[in-house]
């Protein structure tokens, strides 16, 4: 990797897995399968080798955050205010962010049984399709200008200050925000924020989403591998959409396989690859930790900020 990573320490998988004492995976194979995204691939060994050491590392950051908050309260002669520990997770479409986010949520819940661990995706902060159509932005969906960043930053500010906050809910089945549906958050102990844009800054040059994060992860992989995963996932979505005529993807479900692959490859190249190269990948050095995946979805290298 380039000088972009000069501030990171590279750790091999073999070295990383020694940073946690051998233990059970804290979840069953069935539970792991239930939280794994379409066409993603993760094993119990991955949980033990990669994610249990990661949980240990998050605990290190959490203790440091609590100690700093305590020291600040003493300095300012104020009562200590307990704040949620916020984890940001970013990476390309189809790289496996959702699997990682759900797995971390489950593992944190198991290792902190008395804590409330919540998960929110930034998809809910996309503008509704009708607004995007009116603004001529529907073909830019997923790009920075398609997100209501003011609403997202207000949400994070409320969370960080221990206030009850509400997030819109996005449905991939209808490819749109669900009208009048909100997800509520009441001062969780941990909040995982997952999305392609969590390290980006749009319009407001003085404030980044990452300013609210106590820990952050970027899921990385070669773009040619992500393209393959994206196409495989698209084909799996079409199979499911055949059973539901109301699904947004039902309109593509009857395409011959070759045409469906060609369509997905075109969307990847004209939308997702451009978004990755221009707006997502350039932000990865803002993460505290980079998890790099090989062609088989397995994490082979870890980069930890020095």
Swiss-Prot record:
Transmembrane segments: none
S-S pairs: none
Domain of life assignment: Bacteria
Enzyme Commission code: 2.7.1.33
Main location: cytoplasm
Keywords: ATP-binding, Coenzyme A biosynthesis, Cytoplasm, Kinase, Nucleotide-binding, Transferase
Reaction catalyzed: (R)-pantothenate + ATP = (R)-4'-phosphopantothenate + ADP + H(+)
Listed GO MF terms: ATP binding; pantothenate kinase activity
Keyword Cytoplasm: yes
Associated pathway: Cofactor biosynthesis; coenzyme A biosynthesis; CoA from (R)-pantothenate: step 1/5
GO cellular component: cytoplasm
Localization: Cytoplasm
Alphabetized Pfam families for the sequence: PRK
A GO biological-process term: coenzyme A biosynthetic process
Binding site for ATP: 91-98
HAMAP family: Pantothen_kinase_1 (MF_00215)
Family indicated by similarity: Belongs to the prokaryotic pantothenate kinase family.
Protein name, per record: Pantothenate kinase
């Amino acid at each position: 990797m380039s000088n972009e990573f000069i501030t990171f320490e590279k750790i091999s998988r073999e070295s990383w897995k020694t940073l946690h004492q051998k233990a059970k995976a804290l979840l069953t194979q069935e539970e792991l399968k239930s939280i794994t995204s379409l066409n993603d691939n993760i094993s119990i060994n991955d949980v033990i080798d990669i994610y249990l050491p990661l949980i240990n590392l998050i605990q290190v950051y959490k203790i440091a955050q609590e100690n700093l908050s305590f020291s600040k309260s003493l300095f300012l002669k104020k009562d200590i205010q307990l704040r949620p520990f916020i984890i940001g997770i970013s990476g390309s479409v189809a790289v496996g962010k959702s699997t990682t986010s759900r797995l971390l949520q489950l593992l944190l819940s198991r290792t902190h049984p008395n804590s409330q661990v919540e998960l929110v995706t930034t998809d809910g902060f996309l503008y509704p399709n009708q607004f995007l159509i009116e603004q001529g932005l529907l073909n830019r969906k997923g790009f920075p200008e398609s997100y209501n960043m003011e609403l997202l930053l207000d949400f994070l500010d409320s969370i960080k200050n221990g206030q009850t906050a509400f997030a819109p809910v996005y449905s991939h089945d209808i490819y749109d925000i669900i009208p009048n549906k909100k997800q509520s958050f009441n001062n969780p102990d941990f909040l995982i924020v997952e999305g392609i844009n969590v390290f980006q800054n749009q319009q407001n040059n003085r404030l980044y989403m990452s300013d609210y994060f106590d820990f952050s992860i970027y899921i990385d992989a070669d773009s040619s591998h992500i393209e393959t995963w994206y196409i495989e996932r698209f084909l799996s979505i079409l199979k499911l959409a055949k059973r539901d005529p109301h699904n947004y993807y039902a309109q593509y479900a009857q395409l011959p396989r070759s045409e469906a692959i060609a369509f997905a490859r075109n969307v990847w190249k004209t939308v997702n690859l451009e978004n990755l190269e221009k707006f997502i990948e350039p932000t990865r050095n803002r993460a505290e930790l980079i998890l790099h995946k090989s062609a088989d979805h397995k994490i082979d290298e870890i980069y930890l900020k020095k």
